[in-house]
From Swiss-Prot:
Residues 82-91 have a biased composition (Low complexity). This is Late embryogenesis abundant protein 46. Residues 18-39, 47-64 have a biased composition (Basic and acidic residues). GO terms for cellular component: cytosol. GO terms for biological process: embryo development ending in seed dormancy; protein homooligomerization; response to cold; response to osmotic stress; response to water deprivation; seed development. Belongs to the LEA type 1 family. Induction: By dehydration stress. Involved dehydration tolerance. Involved in the adaptive response of vascular plants to withstand water deficit. May possess chaperone-like activity under water deficit. Residues 142-158 have a biased composition (Gly residues). It comes from Arabidopsis thaliana. The keyword Nucleotide-binding does not apply. Residues 1-12 have a biased composition (Polar residues). Pfam families: LEA_1. GO terms for molecular function: copper ion binding; nickel cation binding; osmosensor activity; zinc ion binding.
Amino acid sequence: MQSMKETASNIAASAKSGMDKTKATLEEKAEKMKTRDPVQKQMATQVKEDKINQAEMQKRETRQHNAAMKEAAGAGTGLGLGTATHSTTGQVGHGTGTHQMSALPGHGTGQLTDRVVEGTAVTDPIGRNTGTGRTTAHNTHVGGGGATGYGTGGGYTG
């Protein structure tokens, strides 16, 4: 059940990100058609790129939050009544009892969520996609033919 919720949330985050990116592109095109000033056109392009980056960052944060919640639920961390906290800085917080807190920036606090904090970067948890086709938790002794370091010692060549 939790896996289905995570998948649905990830799909929704991707869809929202795609819509936000499309909206930013269309707004840029409309702004460029309104003006002849190259500075205004460049500003429209920069605004579009900022909105696209923000949409992508929100999608990644949602996916990371979902993955952290899945890991916390599977690990049985004992933080309250089946709840766990997750911080985007990687620090584990205190259990919140029956009040689930969100790791999304500004969510439930009244703060603006459409601003990017300079100097921050998105990181992947250990064992997640590193872009190399393998996770950081790859075991070199498992899988794929050749000498893996394990075997029966038999001579079967089937």
